[in-house]
C-alpha cells in the first residue's frame, strides 16, 4: 500500500512540474497538461512518440502512467484519464457504460505489433508451433525435454510481466483457446524484469511486447537482444527453421508471424483538447514514421521493406 501511495505522489509531483512548464497555458489541441495511461508493454513506443510530440509542441506536457492494460482502461472508464494506449479496442459493454453517461469515445488503430517469446541463450529450444505453445501455457507440457528430448533445460518457467497485462490476455484469448492458463505461470512485474529473468534463468520462457526488442536504433533494445534469444513461431503442425518466423516488421506485415496484435488509442475527449491533438499526432504522418522506425507496422503508411535480417 505504501508503495502504491508513493507512486501516485510521484505522478502528482511530475504533473506539478509539467504545469510549471505550461503555467497559464490554456488547453487546446496542442497545448496544456494532461495525464495519460499506457499499457506498459507499449512503453518504448509511447515514450518516443510523446518525446517528439512535446519537442514539436513546446506548450504541451504529457504525463504518462505506465501500468497494466486492465488498470489503464479502468482509469479511462472512471474518467481519471481521457487517453489510453492499449492493445484492444473498447468492448461493447465499455461503450455502453460511456454512452449511458453521454460520452462517445473512440478506438483509433495506430499500429500492429505482436507478442515476442524469449528464451535463455543457453537454451537449445527456440522454435515452437502454436500447438506446442498451447500445451506449454496450459500446463500440459512442463519440461523442455517434452519438446526436444535431451534439451537439458529442465522445467519450463513461463514468465509474464503482470497478471493483468495485455500479454496475459493475448495468450489466454489467442493461444490457450478453451484451455485455462496454467497456474505455473508467474509474473515478474515489468517487461524489463521479464527480460532480466530470462537472461539469468536457463529454463525460462518469457512473454513480452515486440516493441521492447524491435527498434534496431535503440541501444537498450540491442542490449536486450544480447541477453536473450527471440523464439521463432510456426503455424505448421511441425515447426522447422524454414516455416517458423521471428517478429520482424516484414513478417508482421505479411501475417507469417502468428502472434500479431493491433495497438489502439482509446480516446474520450468531448472537449477536443490535448488528448485529441496527441491522437492526431500518433495517427498522422510523423507519428506513423516513428512507428515504422521502431520496427512495428504503422496503421496508415505504406511499408517499404528492403532487407530482412536472419536474426533479431
Q: Residue ranges of each PLM-predicted region?
A:
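Sec-dependent bacterial lipoprotein signal peptides
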Residues: 1-16
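Residue-level marker of intrinsically disordered, low-complexity segments enriched
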Residues: 1-3, 108, 231
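Amphipathic, positively biased hydrophobic alpha-helical segments used for protein targeting
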Residues: 9-11, 95-97, 306
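Exported/periplasmic ABC-transporter solute-binding proteins
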Residues: 18-58, 62-65, 69-70, 74-77, ...
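Pocket-flanking alpha-helical
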Residues: 70-101, 216
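Periplasmic N-terminal soluble interaction domains immediately after the signal peptide in Gram-negative
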Residues: 102-106
